[in-house]
């Protein structure tokens, strides 16, 4: 059964004036944080998955090899394959070239190393995103407080111009950070997707 697309409630575009932006700033990240349902500071629409399990991608038992970083051949391969700057096709080519000649019995340990490295990098990314989410929440509260102060001032009050300038600078910084976070939030999910690709490649060998 196919779901019917929801029709927009309003066909007419609703424009939000700049005077309303400060009051909306504190709520901008709340819907995505609510989707995470795990950490209120998680700023992404994507579900928060703190750590990836090898069993989610690989059938059967996989025993992690904690000393894989001491392997002079395996360590540089894993770091290159998992590196976010390595394009997908280059990463799969490197992994395929390494995995083709090795026995099938060694491939689970190879995949476990890929999972370890992925989790290490994702953990750093997730911590940074949560820290950024906390900063955005605090910034939204600051903007809302400045707006409340402005509401209590008369147009001719001397303090008004300074507060408006401060509020607008904070709002601009808030909006720019939100824009950057939309892209940064894709990184943990992209790493999870790539890990699934690597698992399928190794299982086909």
Could you describe each region identified by the protein language model?
Residues 118, 125, 132, 136-153:
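Non-transmembrane amphipathic alpha-helical segments
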Residues 37-105:
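N-terminal Sec/ER secretory leader and immediately downstream segment
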Residues 19-27:
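Sec-dependent signal peptide recognition
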């Amino acid at each position: 059964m196919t779901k019917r697309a929801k029709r927009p409630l309003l066909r007419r575009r609703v424009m939000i004036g700049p005077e309303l932006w400060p009051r909306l700033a504190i709520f901008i990240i709340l819907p995505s944080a609510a989707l995470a349902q795990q950490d209120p500071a998680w700023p992404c629409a994507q579900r928060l998955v703190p750590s990836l399990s090898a069993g989610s991608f690989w059938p059967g038992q996989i025993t992690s090899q904690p000393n894989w970083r001491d392997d002079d051949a395996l360590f540089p391969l894993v770091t290159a394959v998992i590196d976010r700057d390595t394009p997908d096709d280059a990463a799969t080519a490197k992994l395929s070239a390494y995995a083709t000649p090795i026995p099938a019995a060694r491939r689970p340990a190879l995949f476990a190393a890929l999972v370890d490295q992925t989790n290490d990098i994702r953990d750093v990314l997730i911590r940074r995103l949560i820290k950024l989410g906390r900063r955005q929440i605090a910034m939204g509260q600051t903007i809302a407080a400045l707006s409340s102060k402005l509401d209590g001032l008369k147009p001719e009050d001397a303090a008004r111009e300074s507060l408006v300038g401060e509020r607008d600078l904070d709002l601009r910084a808030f909006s720019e950070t939100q824009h950057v976070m939309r892209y940064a939030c894709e990184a943990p999910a992209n790493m999870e997707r790539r890990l699934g690709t690597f698992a399928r490649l190794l299982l086909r060998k």
